[in-house]
Amino acid sequence: MLSKFFPHIKEKPLSERVKSRDAFIYLDRVMWSFGWTEPENKRWILPYKLWLAFVNIVMLILLPISISIEYLHRFKTFSAGEFLSSLEIGVNMYGSSFKCAFTLIGFKKRQEAKVLLDQLDKRCLSDKERSTVHRYVAMGNFFDILYHIFYSTFVVMNFPYFLLERRHAWRMYFPYIDSDEQFYISSIAECFLMTEAIYMDLCTDVCPLISMLMARCHISLLKQRLRNLRSKPGRTEDEYLEELTECIRDHRLLLDYVDALRPVFSGTIFVQFLLIGTVLGLSMINLMFFSTFWTGVATCLFMFDVSMETFPFCYLCNMIIDDCQEMSNCLFQSDWTSADRRYKSTLVYFLHNLQQPITLTAGGVFPISMQTNLAMVKLAFSVVTVIKQFNLAERFQ
């Protein structure tokens, strides 16, 4: 069903040419709309840069400030539930501004990484290897659409309910607009801005996921090549050595690819790790003490979306660490015992390098892994425990 509207989420046949960079098709389109890429025609650079400045000043600077001003301007009108709902989104929005800035600054690095993907694609000659690339490309685009559905559902669940209740869903401050007298205008403006904000946040969450997904694609292809070393009879020792050398080049390209992306994702995931415990903690307090049924459903969706910002990426990083161990096993288990001295010495050098796992760190501090992710999520329970011990929830009710 979805593939009728989004054809790139379906695996393409081998008769069509597909490149690894095609996994970013839908993501790049959204980024282009925010001014985060470059126009194809150079004569549009100036208007595009002006659009970039306008959109990002409004969304990354003025929008978080508008939520903060609303606290100062109309704090007494907030109920406890409304305040917590606004606070959890406001905190996440400030973090999202930093995440978007890191992603925007890393545009050139991401372009360098795509060039390296093109070089890795040149090694995919057999139908089996090309089919693997096609499958991962479709998976990358599918993840982008899936995140759009998850994130959009949060807005769709919130906006109609609060509109019918004649209450503002996110309590933003708009100068020269009376939010009570011009309720529908301010509510529609809130809905539009929140939708744009979550799509910006989506880009910062999906970009690392798809990028490392394509890294895992080529790691899996390299594992298969390592298994097949010296498996074709009738070749000379020089040809076997050249085959091993090509695998070493592939591994070097993979390391360069990850190194190009490392500074881009380091800051993004670091900010999210700092936020996830606090945001989930505030959401859990709101859910446990102040939510109605409908606002509780919306809060659960928000908590799910916040968890999706780090969980899939951390899980993928763990899988890549395991893949690196498997790569060294594949090389060691290949048919090298009858090889000449040159081949064996090259293999030993390569085996040593393969045993170094491909890892990412958040801000140069936290290793990006499921263990770190779970440790940060546990902070949410610490926040709830503090609130319950001091009976703060009862005081606000």
Curated annotation (Swiss-Prot):
This is Odorant receptor 22a. Changing T359I: In strain: LA6. GO terms for cellular component: dendrite; dendrite membrane; membrane; plasma membrane; sensory dendrite. InterPro entries: 7tm6_olfct_rcpt. It holds the Pfam family 7tm_6. It is found in: Cell membrane. Interacts with Orco, via conserved C-terminal cytoplasmic loops. Complexes exist early in the endomembrane system in olfactory sensory neurons (OSNs), coupling these complexes to the conserved ciliary trafficking pathway. Interacts with snmp1. Odorant receptor which mediates acceptance or avoidance behavior, depending on its substrates. The odorant receptor repertoire encodes a large collection of odor stimuli that vary widely in identity, intensity, and duration. Involved in the behavioral responses ethyl butyrate and to esters in more general. Complexes with Orco to form odorant-sensing units, providing sensitive and prolonged odorant signaling and calcium permeability. They are necessary and sufficient to promote functional reconstitution of odor-evoked signaling in sensory neurons that normally respond only to carbon dioxide. Changing I67M: In strain: MA43 and MA74. Residues 1-49, 108-136, 204-263, 305-356 are cytoplasmic. Changing R395K: In strain: LA6. Keywords: Cell membrane, Membrane, Olfaction, Receptor, Sensory transduction, Transducer, Transmembrane, Transmembrane helix. The atypical heteromeric and topological design of the odorant receptors appears to be an insect-specific solution for odor recognition, making the OR/Orco complex an attractive target for the development of highly selective insect repellents to disrupt olfactory-mediated host-seeking behaviors of insect disease vectors. Odor-evoked OR currents are independent of known G-protein-coupled second messenger pathways. The chain crosses the membrane at residues 50-70, 87-107, 137-157, 183-203, 264-280, 287-304, 357-377. The gene is Or22a. The keyword Transmembrane helix applies. GO terms for molecular function: ionotropic olfactory receptor activity; ligand-gated monoatomic cation channel activity; odorant binding; olfactory receptor activity.
